[in-house]
């Protein structure tokens, strides 16, 4: 980007022909070297959601560049929502990490993700454990594979050995049964056990989508993890987003 580096840059990152909509936001001053945080939204979400942009701006304010990405089938990226799977999101994440590694100003790389994005960064972080300096899963939905194996997901019950061709997402859109079949094969516990670098988990204790017990269990299982519970808050932090931002700011300040 040169000496007059742009404060914000919109781009497409291509993952095997699929264009992923992305925005790079720089701290002040934009020039020089900076650590970077990749920020990933959740299921049915996008990178312009209130909690996603607020986390990115908080990180920009303490010297981090941020790279927000719309994942496969979400936001303004390619792909149909109904055809997205956790494998596709995971390969998206790995591609974005590789893109970030190629940016000449980047020193360290961190991953932050909300809900399904939180589980995605848990998986990608384990695969790139020698590259990623820290993880911030926000209300991570790592119960998805367990629900897929048990036959209860998205508020629906089904035979896990005979997965239906289509399911309904909570916003009314349909979801291909392959989403469930892929999820059944994933063991997030293995990813947690492989990751030894510092982790911050933030979770509302009245989360209506991902029970807070999953955040607590993941924090206990990680070798180096700080857990911050937000009293009385929901999955998307409708009541106390400021406390989430405070937790992220405190944990990340001075880390790179």
Task: Spell out what each predicted region is.
Residues 2-30:
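N-terminal cap/lid segment of alpha/beta-hydrolase-fold proteins
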Residues 20, 119, 126, 131-217, ...:
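The alpha/beta-hydrolase serine catalytic core
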Residues 33-42:
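Short beta-strand element of the alpha/beta-hydrolase
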Residues 44-56, 71:
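The serine-hydrolase catalytic nucleophile loop
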Residues 56-78:
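Conserved alpha/beta-hydrolase
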Residues 75-104:
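Catalytic nucleophile-loop/oxyanion-hole region of alpha/beta-hydrolase
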Residues 104-115:
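Alpha/beta-hydrolase fold nucleophile elbow
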Residues 113-123:
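Glycine-rich nucleophile elbow surrounding the catalytic serine of serine-hydrolase chemistry
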